[in-house]
Amino acid sequence: MQLLIIRHAIAVPRGTPGIPDEDRPLTPEGEQKFREAAKGLAKLVDRPDALLTSPWLRAKQTATIAAAAWGRLEPKEAAALASGSFDDQAAVLDEYPGDATVAVVGHEPWVSELLARLLGTRHDARLEFKKGGAALVDVPGRLAGGGQLAWFLPPKVLRKL
């Protein structure tokens, strides 16, 4: 499996009065910058077989922008991508065949923890994703360990592709 891990784009700050964390939207700047980054993603990765997203608003908005860059791709919500454990996330991903390319959009710290687990490192020895950043991992078999990092890019680089 090829797994494309994307952190949601820039959202309104946590603690904004009247907006619960799960309802924080992308900022106009976040939307604009991620539209550019998504074009770069589409150049690096052919249209995935599936695009999964956390049900939280900022992740869904990020997934919708990514889907538009690939064309004809409908994001599917997966609750485990909001706050689930690695086992819950792995169960969602195990629904896809080993030759699939799956993109997931989620939040820190789980995107970094997921990447660390896929690469077989300690969960606290992680690469931290910038908002709108992405990583591509080739996963040869089981999801825990053994993955090969193809690339790990911040949004600034994705926007320049």
Name each region found by the language model.
Residues 108-109, 116-127:
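Flexible, glycine-rich active-site loops centered on histidine and acidic residues
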Residues 2-87, 111, 125, 129-131, ...:
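Active-site-proximal alpha-helix that buttresses catalytic centers in soluble enzyme cores
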Residues 122-148, 154-158:
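Domain-level recognition of soluble alpha/beta enzyme cores
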Residues 69-70, 93-96, 122:
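Short, hinge-like loop/turn segments at secondary-structure boundaries
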Residues 89-91:
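Conserved ATP-dependent adenylate/AMP-binding module captured primarily in the ANL superfamily
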Residues 3, 98-106:
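Generic beta-sheet signal
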Residues 65, 117-118, 140:
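Residue-level signal for well-ordered alpha-helical positions
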Residues 44-47, 95-100:
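Glycine-rich phosphate-binding loop signature in dinucleotide/nucleotide-binding domains
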